[in-house]
Curated annotation (Swiss-Prot):
Compositional bias of kind Low complexity: 139-148
Any single biological process term in GO: DNA replication initiation
Coiled coil spans: none
Lineage, uppermost ranks: Bacteria, Pseudomonadati, Pseudomonadota, Gammaproteobacteria, Pseudomonadales
Entry's localization field: Cytoplasm
Main location: cytoplasm
GO cellular component assignments: cytoplasm; plasma membrane
Stated role: Plays an essential role in the initiation and regulation of chromosomal replication. ATP-DnaA binds to the origin of replication (oriC) to initiate formation of the DNA replication initiation complex once per cell cycle. Binds the DnaA box (a 9 base pair repeat at the origin) and separates the double-stranded (ds)DNA. Forms a right-handed helical filament on oriC DNA; dsDNA binds to the exterior of the filament while single-stranded (ss)DNA is stabiized in the filament's interior.
Organism: Pseudomonas putida (strain ATCC 47054 / DSM 6125 / CFBP 8728 / NCIMB 11950 / KT2440)
GO MF annotations in UniProt: ATP binding; ATP hydrolysis activity; DNA replication origin binding; lipid binding
The name this protein goes by in its record: Chromosomal replication initiator protein DnaA
Length: 506
């Protein structure tokens, strides 16, 4: 089987998948032909497992359809093709359970120099891979200090390092996997975080979560830390903001205690650093973190990082750091879709022991779209207003409680703004959107703009039609239905719509 056939099928799969999914899971794969067998290499176990579960079946179908008509023999492996410089796989025992009709792979512990872990895949169906569990981290830290007497939400952990360097880090005990609301927008990030929490040191190192503010990155990071401590209360799990790392380093330099600083940060079992983008243009901090990062990975200790953008897009960050951040798994956290926003509101109301009617939650979720933090803030205002006024939560009460916020949202997301944003995105004129032109290059953006207007504003279909050159409301309805269909079948439209939605609501 030729590598060219594989590339052809990958391009076909690209058309079927959202760009984020393709770039995260399919693009990193490498391939080489070995006789009649095709060998596909994944950079780590997590990518291998996910590709095997989610995409392998479709890839085999495409290979069969575009080749000889027979599904080919194919092997999934961890590592790099032999024509590339291999990178050593982490020390991790891996076991595979394969159905009787499939080739068996013995559980084994990867030697430090090994670059490949093969998992045989038969032509008939995808192989089922199960990752074995490992013991939790070794105890390397002082036991966690008792929580504040008032039952505070943050767990204080204070460690005194000989040489006068004292570090205190916090894990919010309410940020757990149980309190995290999962949806399409954060499914991949949640799955990756759980794998790290349940099986640390298994190759997803570092785990890099990126996305806008208030989307749940910090929640997931705390959830991992809390789970690790639940498994081993004596584990040294250090969570901190990147600015805290810088401050500790400066203090260590002032106290002439840099060696103690290094010893402390390089002795942790798991280092969780939030907002890594704040290292940008801090050369001394980047230098120290570079060596700390290397020491932790060489020692098999877990590193989890978050940022507001993709690592390679962080300006002022050294290329060697960007490269190392890509050694593990990088996952985006997207703004929550409507259903997830409703679920978040219902869960928060339940935690607060407040009755929130579903239509009220839907009303808030429709209008607060940017991030979870703003969503929770809006709910708190509504609950407070309900308590002070002695009234049940209704849509009328929500309008009163969020009067200024809703007015601001309506002002920010207007049909005029949508038309301008869509025209700029597709590089056409606003007048084209309002014209009678029916060429695809104009008609499709017009339909997208109409669908966005229906979703993001409170205008009726006839009102939207009037603002698009005096069109009938049935034209707007057809446009909305067409775009909803295309979002399911056309990856480009789906990506365009998501990008425009993000631009208009953040």
């Amino acid at each position: 089987m030729s590598v060219e056939l594989w590339q052809q099928c990958v391009e076909l799969l690209r058309d079927e998948l959202p760009a984020q999914q393709f770039n995260t899971w399919i693009r990193p794969l490498q391939v080489e032909a070995e006789g009649d067998e095709l060998r596909v290499y994944a950079p780590n176990r997590f990518v291998l497992d996910w590709v095997n579960e989610k995409y392998l079946g479709r890839l085999l179908e495409l290979l069969g359809e575009n080749g000889s008509g027979i599904a080919p023999a194919l092997s999934l492996l961890i590592g790099s093709r032999r024509s590339s410089a291999p990178r050593a796989a982490p020390n991790a025992p891996v076991s595979a359970a394969v159905a009787a009709s499939l080739a068996q792979t013995q559980a084994h512990k990867t030697a430090p120099a090994a670059a490949v872990e093969p998992v045989a895949v038969a032509a008939a169906e995808p192989v089922l891979v199960e990752t074995s569990s490992r013991d939790s981290f070794d105890a390397m830290a002082e036991p966690a200090a008792a929580p504040p007497s008032g039952g505070g939400r943050a767990e204080q952990r204070t460690v005194q390092v000989e040489g006068a360097l004292k570090h205190t880090s916090y894990l919010n005990r309410t940020f757990t996997f149980d309190t995290f609301v999962e949806g399409k927008s954060n499914q991949l990030a949640r799955a990756a975080a759980w794998q790290v929490a349940d099986n640390p040191k298994h190759g997803y190192n570092p785990l890099f979560l990126y996305g806008g503010v208030g989307l749940g990155k910090t929640h997931l990071m705390h959830a991992v830390g809390n789970h690790l401590l639940k498994k081993n209360p004596n584990a040294k799990v250090v969570y901190l903001h990147s600015e805290r790392f810088v401050a500790d380093m400066v203090k260590a330099l002032q106290l002439n205690a840099i060696n103690e600083f290094k010893r402390f940060y390089r002795s942790v079992d798991a280092l969780l650093i939030d907002d890594i983008q704040f290292f940008a243009r801090k050369e001394r901090s980047q230098e120290e973190f570079f060596h700390t990062f290397n020491a932790l990975l060489e020692g098999g200790q877990q590193v989890i990082l978050t940022s507001d953008r993709y690592p390679k897009e962080i300006e002022g960050l050294e290329e060697r750091l960007k490269s190392r951040f890509g050694w593990g798994l990088t996952v985006a956290v997207e703004p929550p879709e409507l259903e997830t926003r409703v679920a978040i509101l219902m869960k928060k109301a339940d935690q607060a022991k407040v009755e929130l009617p579903h239509d009220a939650a839907f009303f808030i979720a429709q209008r607060i779209r940017s991030n979870v933090r703003e969503l929770e803030g809006a709910l708190k205002r509504v609950i407070a207003h309900s308590h002070f006024m002695g009234r049940d939560i209704t849509i009328e009460l929500i309008r009163e409680s969020l009067k200024d916020l809703l007015a601001l949202q309506d002002k920010l997301v207007s049909v005029d703004n949508i038309q301008r944003t869509v025209a700029e995105y597709y590089k056409i004129k606003i007048s084209d959107l309002l014209s009678k032109r029916r060429s695809r290059s104009v008609a499709r953006p017009r339909q997208v703009a109409m669908a966005l207007s229906k979703e993001l504003t409170n205008h009726s279909l006839p009102e939207i039609g009037d603002m698009f050159g005096g069109r009938d409301h049935t034209t707007v309805l057809h446009a909305c239905r067409k775009i909803n269909e295309l979002k399911e079948s056309d990856a480009d439209i789906r990506e365009d719509y998501k990008n425009l939605l993000r631009t208009l609501t953040t």
